[in-house]
Amino acid sequence: MSKVLFIKASPLPNEVSRSSQVAATFIDEYKAKNPSDTVEELVLYNTEVPLLDLELMTAGRELQAGKAFTDLAPDVQKRLNAYNALTEQFLAADKYVFVFPLWNLGIPPLLKAYVDTFVIAGKSFRYTEHGPEALLKGKKAILIHGSGGIYSAGPTSSFTHGEPYLRTILQFIGIDVVPSIFVEGIDHNPSKEAEIVAAAKAVAHESAAEF
């Protein structure tokens, strides 16, 4: 039995977000094919995702130096507890499904803040004399990515730092990232929205059966 963490990184409701609609198709098919697996949904825009800032970095250094957790300020304790809970939730999963849009050629800022909760030296990778070593080998992820333009291939593919960034950072910590599902080009061809979404859902249906 596998534990799947379904991470939604869009503030838009499902009826507006086409990538979320495709992700719902993927999840429904996955559950049908894997009834004994558990799927936990994490909606980032409904979740406290602490930003890795000076306060948290200072608290981390103080704890490493021997300061007791209870000696930290109450608000810092609360933020660290939220941060650490996200870390442990991510590490406990076997598979990951990310759905996220392309914003200004990158990922949403809250998704980047979330990435910082699990890409941690000593947790998901470690430093060795031969360089960094991934610690999450054997886990699997799929990325479902929405964009108004077409960036998965063609002349604009080198512009994007969305799907390639998330794929790279997950591979860095050892996770096997299977081929992504793209929901793209609707802003270029609004009249083809239904066709584009249907094609992406068909890919999602097939991908879920193999995930």
Swiss-Prot record:
It catalyses: 2 a quinone + NADH + H(+) = 2 a 1,4-benzosemiquinone + NAD(+); N,N-dimethyl-1,4-phenylenediamine + anthranilate + 2 NAD(+) = 2-(4-dimethylaminophenyl)diazenylbenzoate + 2 NADH + 2 H(+). Transmembrane segments: none annotated. The keyword Flavoprotein applies. This is FMN-dependent NADH:quinone oxidoreductase 2. The lineage of its organism: Bacteria, Bacillati, Bacillota, Bacilli, Bacillales. Homodimer. GO terms for molecular function: electron transfer activity; FMN binding; oxidoreductase activity, acting on NAD(P)H as acceptor; oxidoreductase activity, acting on NAD(P)H, quinone or similar compound as acceptor. Keywords: Flavoprotein, FMN, NAD, Oxidoreductase. Binds 1 FMN per subunit. Pfam families: Flavodoxin_2.
